[in-house]
Amino acid sequence: MSRLTLALDVMGGDIGPRITIPASLQALEKDPMLSLLLFGDSRQIQSELDKVSDKISSDVGERLAIRHASHVIDNNQSVTEALRHSKGTSMRLAIESVQRGEAQGCVSGGNTGALMGLAKVILQPLKGIQRPALVSILPTIDGNHSVMLDLGANIDCNAENLYQFALMGAIFAENQLNLVFPRVALLNIGVEAIKGYKSIREASEMIKQNTALNYIGFIEGNYLLNGIADVIVSDGFAGNVALKTLEGAAQNVIGLLKGHSRNNVLKPLFGRLMKILFRDSYQRLRSINPEQYNGASLIGLTSVVVKSHGGAGINAFSNAVKDAALQVRQQIPQKILDGLNK
């Protein structure tokens, strides 16, 4: 395991330092070769650190540094407004530290559009990549995992964009999931060749021509978690809707299994009974919880950038930091570039 430094936008997300600081400490405790630069309001950061100062070992304390940022990009700001007023914000300063080489990757739970825009401008896409994409690892019902992209970075995509997503997704899956010749599929409204937008059909033909890709054709939304494909490619609109639908469905069913009922007397008994009867199914559904696999990566850039869920808890944000560290150690950007040049 190699030493590395990550830059964290600790003001990003719905809660900010009350989540990101404990999560940062958790990540440092689990990874003795990791150092963190914490970008945000120094008073708030120090206040959160003071709350647990008696639990912070000298080793962990030596591997974190506070970098003050006087401003924060609001989640409700438009991309244009956020970029125009990004100077001095925790998100921008974190990304700039990666550009300067002070850190090898960045993690933020802040405004997704602003993070993508700043990363593209400051860190730059890899040579030949038209658009970076948001990618995440999803659990499948057979106990394995798959990769899905784009999850919201690019609402409108042409055939070339989708083709490049397939290339990047396959390389990402090979390294993150340790797969050989991962199966690639395009998300569509049907499996027939005539179905879907023209861009999807054209992308399908382009992917077929590349023998380096193990293309299996179209996949419909009801099979996303079935383990049929290792890499699922879509435009950002469809991908984002599909992901949130899966998460919401899983959370609702988990709530049912836990016994969420208006009857307070029967609720505990019902919850325990459902967990016993459907133990295996319950555990599989829990794996779809964003807390377990939090962190969508913006791939196609010269450096690692991970977007955490805005509502992520301590464990979830810590997992996003862990994922960013893994990608840096695996040299994902360089491997994508090498794969594109083959």
Curated annotation (Swiss-Prot):
Localization, UniProt: Cytoplasm
Pfam families tied to this protein: FA_synthesis
Please give the pathway this protein is involved in.
Answer: Lipid metabolism; phospholipid metabolism
What InterPro entries has UniProt attached to this entry? Answer: FA_synthesis, Phospholipid_synth_PlsX-like
Q: GO molecular function: any one? A: phosphate:acyl-[acyl carrier protein] acyltransferase activity
Q: Which reaction does it catalyse?
A: a fatty acyl-[ACP] + phosphate = an acyl phosphate + holo-[ACP]
Task: Tell me, in a sentence or two, what this protein's role is.
Answer: Catalyzes the reversible formation of acyl-phosphate (acyl-PO(4)) from acyl-[acyl-carrier-protein] (acyl-ACP). This enzyme utilizes acyl-ACP as fatty acyl donor, but not acyl-CoA.
Q: What is this protein called?
A: Phosphate acyltransferase
- Can you name the source organism? Actinobacillus succinogenes (strain ATCC 55618 / DSM 22257 / CCUG 43843 / 130Z)
Q: Gene name, please?
A: plsX
